[in-house]
Every structure is written in C-alpha cells, then in structure tokens.
Amino acid sequence: MKLKWKFNDLTGEKELERINRIVIDTEEKVEKALAFIDLEPSEAMFFNGYQTWTLSREYSRYDKMRGLNGMPEGVIRRYSLDGYGDYHIASYPYKPGVFHGFSYCYFRDGENYRFFGSLDEKPGYTIFGYNVKKNRLKIIRDAEGLVPDGSFHLLDLFYIEGTEEEVFDAWFEALGINAVPAPKIVGYSSWYNRFQDIDHGTIVQDLKGCKTILEPGDLFQVDDGWESAVGDWEPDPEKFPSGMKAMADEIHSAGFMAGLWISPFVAAKGSRVLKEHPEWVINDHKGETFSCGCNWRGFYGLDIDIPECLEYIENSVKKAVFDWGFDLLKMDFLYAGATFGNDKETRAGRMIRIMELVRQWVGDKRILACGVPLMPAFGLADYSRIGCDVGLSWRDRPFLRQIHRERVSTVNSIMDTIYRRQLDGRAFGNDPDVFFLRYENIELTEEEKDIVATVNALLGSVFLTSDDPGKYTEEQKERFRYYRHLTEAKNVKLIQHERIGFSYILDGREHEYLIPEDKVKE
C-alpha cells in the first residue's frame, strides 16, 4: 500500500511498512500535516474515541457517527456540550461510512485485523478519518499552529495485520510501553448512589456496610462531594468537620485501601480559586474563555504554563496523598487541562506532560485516571476509565440520547468496555465503571444488572459497586461473591457472531456468556 503525505506545501509518498516515521526538517509553522492511504473497508471498523467517555465501538460501513448533529446551537452553548469531546477539533458530517478516531483504529474481517496505531502522540494527536465511499484513510497530525524547533514528526505510524492478540501485542512492543503493575481491585465508590450528597455520617454508614462484604485491602473510594468547591481542594467544613485525614484514617482502620476523587486541573464557576485567579483559566485560540462542560454549573481548565497555578495544582495533589494519607486518587476531568495547545506544544503534548507530572507527584501511590485521552495515560496511570459513566437506567431518556458521545449511558459503557478491552494489562488496568446489585434508587432490571456486573468482572481490572452493602440480603451477598470470583476468570475471549458474548476459563472449566441481542443495539 502507498502512503501519501503532505506537510504545508511539501508532498511525498512511500510504501506502507510496519513502522512509518516521517520527520520534516523545518522551523516553519505547521498549517497542514496529514497522510492518505487508499484502503478497502472491512465488515467491522473501530476508531478510538477522543477521551475516556467518548463512545468507542465497532461500526459497519452503513453506520453513522453522531456528534452534536441536530442539537440547537443555543443548547450547545448553554450547557457547553462541545466542551467534553473533540467537537472543537474534528468534524461530524453524520453520513454513513464516515468515521474518525484518535491514536489507533482497526479494520476487522472475522479474526483478521488491519491495525493502525500511533507510536508517539507528543508531536500531536494522530487522528484517523475514514470514508467508505472514497476507500480512503486520512491521517491527520493535530499540530496546527505549532512552530517546530528544527524538526517535526509528521507521522509516527505503526501498521500490522494479524489476530487481535498479535496486533495489540506487537503495537505495545513497538511503543516500548509496559503497564504499571496494577493488581485487580475490588471495592466501593460513593458516587452512583449518593452522588454529591455525602458527608462524614453517610460515608461512615457505607464504610460499616462494606465491612460486611469487602475483604481486607479492598478499595473504599470517597467520590465527588467532599470538597468545599471544585477547584478549592479543602474539605467542606460542614460535611467533613474532622477533615479528610481523619476520613482516610477511618478507612484504613476498617482494613481498606483509601481512595479519593479529585479533579486538580479544573475549577468550577464560583470557586474561590477562580475568584482570586481568573487569569489561570485556559483560553481558546481566539483568547476567549472556553467552558469544558456544564458540571457544577460550568467549569474551566487551569493553565499549567502559569508557575503559580501549577504549584497550586501540585500542592493539592500531594496534600491528598502525603498529608491526608489516601492510597489512590481518582483524577477526573483530566482532558480539561489540555483542551488547546500553542505554538510551542500541541494539546497532546500538554496532556502527556500532565500525566507525567501527576505520576511524578504521587510516587508509588495509585492513579485512577478518568476523563482522559487514553494514549497519553499509557504506562503512566495505574488504572484508567475506558468508558462513559453508567446510568441508573439502561438507555436513558430519549432526548438525552441526542447529546454528545460522552454522555452518561449504561449501554454505551458496555460497548466501550468491550471494544477497549485490549488495553487492559497492556496500557494500564481498565476501569469499566461500577456495577449494581441494589433494589432501591435504580431502574436497571435484574438482567441488565447481571450484564453490567459480568462484563465488568470479565474485562476490567477495577470492580467497584456504589451500593450500600449494609443493605444487602444474603442472596445479594452471594451474588457479590459470585461476581468477585468471576474476576479471576482466565483466557477471556470475545464471541462476535449473531450475539456478542465471551468464552472464559474459571475453576478449570470453560464457560460461555452471551448478551441478549436487544441489549446492545445503539
């Protein structure tokens, strides 16, 4: 296959090889940096989404990739719906057979994969765009506006054909990336039951409940709601009057690993830090404030190029692990710290720098990355979310299905977990999000709860619930123990014929699990 490339006014071509590096000697500002490969479509095609929550599944040649198409501009602006994903980077024509993704993609026919992956994202995200009608794969280096210091990596591309195991093993070998040794963890997160409505009393209540079912060394994670404001990383004095060190000590006394949610690279409207330092906010290329989403009535990314801002972020992170004693930080909304690059650094380069910084700051404490472009987290995060948030229902309300690809959706979370499964143990430990067994405050059927728990147990390295186990019946406790045992399954293989499912080996015997067909249709 021929690979044709273009850098500004320069053009060239070469034979596609396993490793394709094109380096341009230049100090010229990047205006165009792309390549083309003529390529026949496959029966199934996968394009990795921009970040953790971006829907990432296999597509047929007849499918469409939905962005914010049809959403009124006023609604987009009011709720900053374009702040969560790649809507300021890529276009969404919403036509059959037109797809795009970041860092890697593949074309699958049966068991044979044609795989394309980036070997280095620091010079700019590698964006793969495909058009079935044109039979063309377009590869864009997301580096517009960058001024190189003498050379520019137009392309660092890996290509291979083979089975799933062969192509992903070969890619990570070529990358030279080894996942941080991260054992599977089981435990609890406060988010998907109490959400931000937590305080010392409710956390202690759930901690007591967890002692009835969790094992020593399991994770007990305090999620969003403990802080006085997002961006002001001190405990709310009314909710947690004894402070977060006391909370971590209580978790440790119960025999569990203590986890804490934090979003150190963002600040919400109304936070003290934004009132005192409005100049810390990241602006877009026009110099205008860019809202990264509508959580907490709106929030903004913080500029790590401002020394005082970076020091503030570093101190907030270190305080949580070294002063308060938390063993794991769930670092959320990481993408917001790198929504834009500049003439010296691409947005991907900035995202990688953020991940390198937090790895350095926390030392051997554990990082669970969330809301993060995935490849910058390879080999740096211990664990990473690889899908969107699950919901309390299966498909959510019809009007919510029209918003961004990063929306809360249980069925989308299942798809993400299935189709990003290959990253588990290679890039980091995959976190598929939580499962539920409870009967209250939930709309999922028993069948749907079983699907979530089974998929998470088989394909992930993080297996958390947000239930209060103190309310579990003996039957629910037995089911919890069953799913926990399922996390020990070996040789898990995807089945993709008339129905999606898995084969696996547990207790020396081969098993098969099939998901009902109507549950995984978009």
For the regions a language model picked out, list residue spans one by one.
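N-terminal accessory beta-strand-rich subdomains and adjacent acidic, glycine-rich linkers
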Residues: 1-167
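Carbohydrate-binding surfaces of carbohydrate-active enzymes
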Residues: 203, 209-214, 236, 247-258, ...
